[in-house]
UniProtKB/Swiss-Prot annotation:
One Gene Ontology term from the biological process aspect of the record: pantothenate biosynthetic process
Assembly mode: Homodecamer; pentamer of dimers.
Catalytic reaction(s) noted: 3-methyl-2-oxobutanoate + (6R)-5,10-methylene-5,6,7,8-tetrahydrofolate + H2O = 2-dehydropantoate + (6S)-5,6,7,8-tetrahydrofolate
Positions bound to Mg(2+): 53, 96, 128
Protein EC: 2.1.2.11
The name this protein goes by in its record: 3-methyl-2-oxobutanoate hydroxymethyltransferase
Length: 277
């Protein structure tokens, strides 16, 4: 049952993340898609929970993040927010704006960002892109909705890239990424995710901004790090990118438990008299 009477700790805000950057305190961020995991991660002290459009991959089995809808994202976000609320209430909750929920126009972007914020008590939205979305970011932040940016490898643009290789290795793309980061900050973004870019470039971006950077495959110089929870738990045995640190092989553990359960049921070892009424 939820521990609604347990002491609450100070909720992580955009201001707190800025303070953490200034104080040299690293920011921890993980994805969360459901109530139970959100409670566990909040209790563990994770600073930011990202309701990622990666739910399209790890929950629905799609090969890309593109198919997930705004309604599906809101469903996951509501569960995560409830989980944080029923634990310490500390973690910030950020939700990805899914593909084509903000690309058509700044007006459409504002409408959908407002819909997301109104339907659950999340803290911010996250958007992929640089100069092409700056107008939308400014319009959204101007009405009081915090926006986290995302540069480098942008999964919603995977068909444009053609692969998940490291981005901004060439000088022209690296210079554009630097400009985009500065534009996002000026537009009002409170933080920027840097995905799969050279460590030296990530360090340069981090040093050039007053807002925090959160890396995924972008080196240790970023102000924080983010990973997909399923990846660090080893739930996907086919996915082992270089930037992921797998802390446990939960895939094998769950399979072992399930096999033992099947054996116990078939052998009439479960339920025992102690597990019956």
């Amino acid at each position: 049952m939820p521990h609604r009477d347990q002491p609450k700790t100070a909720h992580v805000t955009t201001r707190r993340l800025l303070d953490m950057k200034q104080q040299g305190e690293k920011i921890s961020m993980l994805t969360a898609y459901d109530y139970t995991m959100a409670r566990i991660l909040d209790r563990a002290g994770v600073d930011v929970l990202l309701v990622g459009d990666s739910a399209s991959n790890v929950f629905s089995g799609h090969s890309t993040t593109l198919p997930i809808t705004i309604e599906e994202m809101i469903y996951h976000a509501k569960a995560v927010v409830r989980g944080v609320h029923d634990e310490t209430g500390r973690a910030m909750v950020v939700i990805d704006m899914p593909f084509m929920s903000y690309q058509l126009s700044s007006e459409e972007a504002l409408r959908n960002a407002g819909k997301i914020m109104k339907e659950h008590e999340c803290d911010a939205v996250k958007m992929e892109g640089g100069h092409v979305i700056v107008e939308s970011v400014k319009r959204i932040t101007d009405v009081g909705i915090p926006v986290m940016g995302h540069l480098g490898l942008m999964p919603q643009s995977i068909y444009k890239y053609g692969s998940y290789r490291v981005r901004a290795q060439e000088e022209q793309e690296a210079e554009q990424l630097l400009r985009d980061a500065e534009l996002l900050e000026k537009a009002g973004a409170f933080a920027i995710v840097l995905e799969k870019i050279p460590s030296a470039l990530a360090a340069q971006v981090t040093a050039s901004l007053t807002i925090p950077t959160i890396g995924i495959g972008a080196g240790v110089a970023c102000d924080g790090q983010v990973l997909v929870i399923n990846d660090i738990l080893g739930l996907n045995r086919e996915f082992h990118p270089r930037f992921v640190r797998q802390y446990v092989d939960l895939n094998s553990m769950i399979e072992q438990v399930a096999r033992q359960y099947v054996t116990d049921v078939r052998g009439c070892d479960f339920p025992s008299s102690n597990e019956s009424y």
